[in-house]
């Protein structure tokens, strides 16, 4: 069987969509479902389109790791140092030495615990209801509803956040987050299990409600994406039937991963700079508009 270049082109379009939408509050999964249906990418049998989406999401996650490598690596080192220093403090008589190490590594340990806490709620729900979510929520109808509901919530919650920010303190340093704030953000991340809601929109809204600045909420969203998406992707990759893979599929995976990675690198940098100057309202308006258009297309049976 020869290489299907048209299918590879469609796969690259999906990878571009993933890179453009993964880290902005518009729902990458919703857009991939929609675009995949429009260009007939999702019609291939054997579950490859679903597995392909998982792989290109890993490409997007790699972009976060690259851009925030200094913060990630230092936090991992401090997290482990804190644990070993705590053990050493209990086992050794040299308390001064280990108490100093504990103080030096406390920031990284606290950050690591916040990420773990923020990951737990969606991880539990995702594991318990993985098959049900895939079966009942992954459709253009649920995406249309998610677009609209998420857009309205973004407008309402951001307006309340901006009023609150004028009269009370908000957290502007990601290392000053509390465990309670990370838990609330993690609970909001559960909304992202509904395609169309958007993981970044859900966690940013949770950040606003918990008292985080937009920039801190967004950056914490990026860090939460690493364990959340790697875990979900690992589960999907484990379940895939690789016996049906062919050369076209393999080329699509490699190129799609690279394209999603490159596009995500650009988008993350631009998005953070945008948020430092302007509100999220434009994304919310786009979501509502896209949801209405999608609902009309479904109602008129242009797409199913």
UniProtKB/Swiss-Prot annotation:
GO BP annotation list: cell wall organization; peptidoglycan biosynthetic process; regulation of cell shape; response to antibiotic
Bilayer disposition of the protein: Multi-pass membrane protein
UniProt keyword terms in alphabetical order: Antibiotic resistance, Cell membrane, Cell shape, Cell wall biogenesis/degradation, Hydrolase, Membrane, Peptidoglycan synthesis, Transmembrane, Transmembrane helix
A Pfam family hit: BacA
Subcellular location(s) of the protein: Cell membrane
Gene name of the encoded protein: uppP
Function as written in the Swiss-Prot or TrEMBL entry: Catalyzes the dephosphorylation of undecaprenyl diphosphate (UPP). Confers resistance to bacitracin.
Name the UniProt record assigns to this protein: Undecaprenyl-diphosphatase
Predominant location category: membrane
GO cellular component: plasma membrane
Family: Belongs to the UppP family.
Catalytic activity line of the entry: di-trans,octa-cis-undecaprenyl diphosphate + H2O = di-trans,octa-cis-undecaprenyl phosphate + phosphate + H(+)
Additional notes on this entry: Bacitracin is thought to be involved in the inhibition of peptidoglycan synthesis by sequestering undecaprenyl diphosphate, thereby reducing the pool of lipid carrier available.
Transmembrane helix is among the record's keywords: yes
Leading EC class: hydrolase
One Gene Ontology molecular-function label: undecaprenyl-diphosphatase activity
Residues that span the membrane, as ranges: 5-25, 47-67, 72-92, 111-131, 137-157, 209-231, 248-268, 282-302
Enzyme Commission number(s) from the entry: 3.6.1.27
